[in-house]
């Protein structure tokens, strides 16, 4: 089944390019770990999901690109065409000559309604090209104006017009130190609206990805391109094909549906994170060897201690003993002793994958009491390696991972709101104080729900 990607704003378009490039690069890499027939099936499954094909055989991304300024879209189209491996559709873009000025209200209340018909028409045409349609993957930032404001508007429209299709939003959490003075306002408005209209929010924190680039990839001067390539690697490791069952020789046909089924059992809990191992520079990789036991031990402890990468894991964090109340349940006033999960999915790719032991992820102590571990944990496998790694593991998790960052953004936004700072920039475009109050209420409920797991 095919996925239509909607790339919104500078952030969404730059990441979208890296994702498609990573997917196609991986699917055409020469892997010595599986037979030719299996490799061809893998390539065909990847293409069906993310690409259509021109008569001359050039793959075309199943994507719609939206921005209110032409510069980034033109750069994105050019980079894809210059790759020689794939390109975007000739009529898959919508751009204007006036941005949203980092104002969520302008993106949501002005640009969104003004260009609704044109944007939704492009999306409809892309959906109609799919023989079998799985849903939408929407890539956007949370803190700006175009990606966040128009992103929230478009997602709401997709929910209205494609209510039976799945919608997953990949959102970029802003740096804690701040890129935009009103980023906390933009963030709470984005999140509260997406929580009503999206089926799942796949969250990447800029601070965490920046640390991966610095500490694991050993990059000295980190660019947005470096960060976006890490994001693309993580997303590719989730969305590339895996077997539907250990005994099956058929790749999963409905990636979005399978992800939602396993990871979002209740509409109150939609926040998903990605952790992957290993992640390192080419130079380090040449001198490294990996075992499944070692990779999974690190991945499990990253989950328990809420670590975003292998380096600096807190090995003292432990789940409570089964049957005992957790002394380390999340409290906003205390350190995170233990990260409780609702659901976890481990995806394993590479050599000897059938020998990997994932029993440690089935421990009932890892999960909230209202879900049986048999329903809360799933594993997908394929012996075909991903990217440059002979063995790799990725964890997609619905857990308490975002409680502290979310509470921090809500509190910062509330402090600004209480002093009426910059409110006029929003009210003049139709976002009233009541809209802010609704957003605060909605997100405070999300924080409380995750805290009480």
UniProtKB/Swiss-Prot annotation:
GO CC terms, sorted: centriole; cilium; cytoplasm; microtubule; nucleus
GO biological process terms on file: cell projection organization; microtubule-based process; positive regulation of smoothened signaling pathway
Classification via PROSITE patterns: TUBULIN
Pfam families, per the entry: Tubulin
Sequence intervals crossing the membrane: none
GO molecular function, one term: GTP binding
SUPFAM superfamilies registered for this protein in UniProt: Tubulin C-terminal domain-like, Tubulin nucleotide-binding domain-like
Entry annotated with the keyword Endoplasmic reticulum: no
UniProt similarity note: Belongs to the tubulin family.
Protein name: Tubulin delta chain
UniProt organism field: Macaca fascicularis
Native organism taxonomy: Eukaryota, Metazoa, Chordata, Craniata, Vertebrata
């Amino acid at each position: 089944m095919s996925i239509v990607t909607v790339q919104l704003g500078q952030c969404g378009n730059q990441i979208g390019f890296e994702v498609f490039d990573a997917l196609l690069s991986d699917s055409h890499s020469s892997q010595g770990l599986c037979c030719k027939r299996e490799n061809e099936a893998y390539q065909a499954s990847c293409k069906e999901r993310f690409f259509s094909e021109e008569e001359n055989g050039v793959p075309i991304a199943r994507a719609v690109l939206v921005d209110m300024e032409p510069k980034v879209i033109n750069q994105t189209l050019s980079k894809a065409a210059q790759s020689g491996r794939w390109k975007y559709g000739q009529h898959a873009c919508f751009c204007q000559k006036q941005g949203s000025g980092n104002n969520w209200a302008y993106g949501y209340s002005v640009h969104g309604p003004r260009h609704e018909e044109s944007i939704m028409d492009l999306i409809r045409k892309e959906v109609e090209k799919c023989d079998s349609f799985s849903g939408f993957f929407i890539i956007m930032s949370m803190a700006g104006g175009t990606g966040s404001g128009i992103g929230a508007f478009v997602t709401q429209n997709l929910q209205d017009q494609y209510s039976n299709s799945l919608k997953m939003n990949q959102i970029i959490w802003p740096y804690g130190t701040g890129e935009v003075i009103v980023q906390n306002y933009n963030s709470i408005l984005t999140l509260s609206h997406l929580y009503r209209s999206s089926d799942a929010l796949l969250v990447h924190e800029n601070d965490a990805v920046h640390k991966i680039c610095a500490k694991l990839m050993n990059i000295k001067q980190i660019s947005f391109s470096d960060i976006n390539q890490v994001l693309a690697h993580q997303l590719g490791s989730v969305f590339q094909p895996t077997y539907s069952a250990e005994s099956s020789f058929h790749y999963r046909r409905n990636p979005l549906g399978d992800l939602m089924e396993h990871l979002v059992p209740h509409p109150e809990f939609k926040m998903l994170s990605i952790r992957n191992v290993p992640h390192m520079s080419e130079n380090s990789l040449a001198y490294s060897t990996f075992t499944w036991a070692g990779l999974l031990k690190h991945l499990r402890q990253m989950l328990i201690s809420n670590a975003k990468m292998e380096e600096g894991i807190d090995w003292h964090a432990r789940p409570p003993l089964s049957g005992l109340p957790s002394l380390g349940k999340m409290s906003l006033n205390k350190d995170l002793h233990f990260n409780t999960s609702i659901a976890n999915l481990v995806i394993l790719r590479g050599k000897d994958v059938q020998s990997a032991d994932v029993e440690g992820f089935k421990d009932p102590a890892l999960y909230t009491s209202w879900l049986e571990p048999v329903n809360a944990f799933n594993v997908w496998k394929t012996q075909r390696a991903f990217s440059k790694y002979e063995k790799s593991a990725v964890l997609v998790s619905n857990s308490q991972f975002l409680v502290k960052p979310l509470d921090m953004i809500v509190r910062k936004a509330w402090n600004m709101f209480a002093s009426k700072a910059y409110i006029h920039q929003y009210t003049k475009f139709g976002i009233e104080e009541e809209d802010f109050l609704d957003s605060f209420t909605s997100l405070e409920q999300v924080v409380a729900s995750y805290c009480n797991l």
